Amino acid sequence: MSDSAVATSASPVIAQAASGEKKVSTKKGSSTPESKKSTAAPPSHPPTQQMVDASIKNLKERGGSSLLAIKKYIGATYKCDAQKLAPFIKKYLKNAVANGNVIQTKGKGASGSFKLSASANKDAKPKASAVEKKTKKVNASAARATKSKSSTSTTKKAAGAADKKLSKSAAAKKNVEKKKADKEKAKDAKKTGTIKAKPTTAKAKSSATKPKTPKPKTTSAKPKKVVSATTPKKTAVKKPKAKTASATKK
């Protein structure tokens, strides 16, 4: 009886231990892929193609950029180990020369100097990395929040200033309209004054022309004087003839 009691009492302990081991094993198995996913950090630099194109473009060397200059530029700007990336850089340069995206001005293989072609210059704009994009998004959201706060205050100020400007502009418009109305009234008054003055000048002209009508009377009176002047001349000529005839008879 004692042996059976010990066996029965020990069995639940073994069962609990086995269940605990299973739970631990399941937890470990489930945690490993998640930990791998979480630890896989995004790359801190863009692809080698973009880095090489950007370095050649920004170095702006007339004879072309050498491999050492490209490595130095990549290490300084992107803060990565350029020596580890050297085989990838060489491979890209060879493929780019074969495709025509890069022109090799000196040397052979990856040891010479390189220039971007005309088509590659257009497409060589460096794209921001994923980390830079995230930081830009965070900064942009913070900037938007600050801008929204400042914009509300500025909109209130702008609204008050706009109301003041509107009131000032309305008053200025009223003054301008009043001035225009006064000018129009003055013009109308001048026009009416000139129109009223015109008939007086016409009347003066008519009164001045009326005395000219008696001129024909003076012309009719002049021939009468001429006729009276001619008759005495005829009598003066006839009288000497009569005197000569009486003298001959005597």
Curated annotation (Swiss-Prot):
Outline the extent of the H15 domain: 44-118
Give Gene Ontology CC terms: nucleosome; nucleus
Q: Basic residues compositional bias: what residue ranges? A: 235-250
Which keywords does UniProt give here?
Answer: Chromosome, DNA-binding, Nucleus
* Polar residues compositional bias, start-end: 1-11
Q: What domain of life does the UniProt record list for this protein's source? A: Eukaryota
Q: Name one GO biological process term.
A: chromosome condensation
Q: Spell out the SMART domains in the cross-references.
A: H15
Q: List the SUPFAM superfamilies hit by this protein, alphabetically.
A: Winged helix' DNA-binding domain
The record's region (Disordered) falls at: 1-52, 104-250
Q: Where is the protein found, in the record's own terms?
A: Nucleus; Chromosome
Q: Low complexity composition bias: which ranges?
A: 140-161, 192-234
Q: Which family does it belong to?
A: Belongs to the histone H1/H5 family.
Task performed by this protein = Histones H1 are necessary for the condensation of nucleosome chains into higher-order structures.
The name on file for this protein is Histone H1.1
Origin species, per record, is: Drosophila virilis (Fruit fly)
Classification of source organism? Eukaryota, Metazoa, Ecdysozoa, Arthropoda, Hexapoda
